[in-house]
Amino acid sequence: MNWLTNVVRPKIRNILRRETPENLWIKCPDSGHLVFYKDVEANQFVIPGSNYHMRMGAAARLKSIFDNETWYDIALPEVTPDPLKFRDERKYVDRIKDARAKTGMNDAIKVGYGKLEGGAVVVAVQDFDFMGGSLGMAAGEAIVRGIELAVEKQSPFILFAASGGARMQEGILSLMQMPRTTVGVQMLRDAKLPYIVVLTNPTTGGVTASYAMLGDVQIAEPGALIGFAGARVIEQTIREKLPEGFQRAEYLKEHGMIDMVVHRHDLKATLARLCRLLTKAPMPEVIVESEPEPEPEPVVAEIIPPTSDLPVSAPAPAPVAAQTPAPAAPSA
């Protein structure tokens, strides 16, 4: 029994652990139901049934927006990784290394250039998995570089915001990115190019005090948390209970803070339509295929077979020739 307990059973457990992925199932934060990860991934990270919008990585977001799931990654300028030599519980450089290993990104923002329903666009995406999508020098440089490319290509600039605010490990250098990105937005306005912002869950802090709320059109995903300070901080400051749904996308739309709340499945079509309207681009031709006319049904002659019950008509009599009388004999 000792051999079975100490040797065989642990080996079986190790085999089962290796064969079962850690992210095989996802628990829906809204309904609490377990959902198969592959189903969520195939549904653009929207929980089937509850329609809860999960966080979406930068690469998956770009893949869902661009035509044929292809785009050009824009090379971003290098910045000093740790200008203040900051350290709290861990070194700032160690946190950056962990975030890069987790996401495969150099920093919190990824910029791509490609086609959106045939029209050229520049898209910048913040990834919340990279240190909470915080705004630092590298993220600020990425936004400015994306705006400069949009001005160069004369194309709309679309930004997906997802952030907890400015990156505290960079101090005033992080806060400086707020006015820098605001100046970048002004560059788009001077060039008369559309700037569309999609607010995702969550978008808070200094990001909402700068570029995230300066779009020509403000779109939000359903249920997204959007605000500057947290709800608990506001309640403690004003000493009042906040209304239900405060700082959620639907609440902000009802109070005029954003323009529309769009389901993730409809985002691509909505963004393409807005870009065409704001740039006065021609609408794509819609070819309506007319249904072919139905072929006429063949007419089949109905033949009634003769039956013995039908009366048989007698043959018609032959015509009789009219007889002329013989002439009378002449008298003597």
Swiss-Prot record:
Keyword flag Nucleotide-binding: yes
Pathway it works in: Lipid metabolism; malonyl-CoA biosynthesis; malonyl-CoA from acetyl-CoA: step 1/1
Residue span(s) of domain CoA carboxyltransferase N-terminal: 24-293
Record's subunit section: Acetyl-CoA carboxylase is a heterohexamer composed of biotin carboxyl carrier protein (AccB), biotin carboxylase (AccC) and two subunits each of ACCase subunit alpha (AccA) and ACCase subunit beta (AccD).
Name of this chain's protein: Acetyl-coenzyme A carboxylase carboxyl transferase subunit beta
Domain of life: Bacteria
Chief localisation class: cytoplasm
Catalytic activity of the protein: N(6)-carboxybiotinyl-L-lysyl-[protein] + acetyl-CoA = N(6)-biotinyl-L-lysyl-[protein] + malonyl-CoA
PANTHER family: ACETYL-COENZYME A CARBOXYLASE CARBOXYL TRANSFERASE SUBUNIT BETA, CHLOROPLASTIC (PTHR42995:SF5)
Chain intervals for the UniProt region annotation (Disordered): 288-332
Lineage of origin: Bacteria, Pseudomonadati, Pseudomonadota, Alphaproteobacteria, Hyphomicrobiales
One annotated GO molecular function: acetyl-CoA carboxylase activity
Family of the protein in this entry: Belongs to the AccD/PCCB family.
Alphabetically ordered keywords of this record: ATP-binding, Cytoplasm, Fatty acid biosynthesis, Fatty acid metabolism, Lipid biosynthesis, Lipid metabolism, Nucleotide-binding, Transferase
Protein task: Component of the acetyl coenzyme A carboxylase (ACC) complex. Biotin carboxylase (BC) catalyzes the carboxylation of biotin on its carrier protein (BCCP) and then the CO(2) group is transferred by the transcarboxylase to acetyl-CoA to form malonyl-CoA.
Subcellular location: Cytoplasm
Record-linked InterPro entries: AcCoA_carboxyl_beta (IPR034733), Acetyl_CoA_COase_Trfase_b_su (IPR000438), ClpP/crotonase-like_dom_sf (IPR029045), COA_CT_N (IPR011762)
One Gene Ontology cellular component annotation held by this UniProt entry: acetate CoA-transferase complex
UniProt biased composition (Low complexity): 298-332
E.C. code: 2.1.3.15
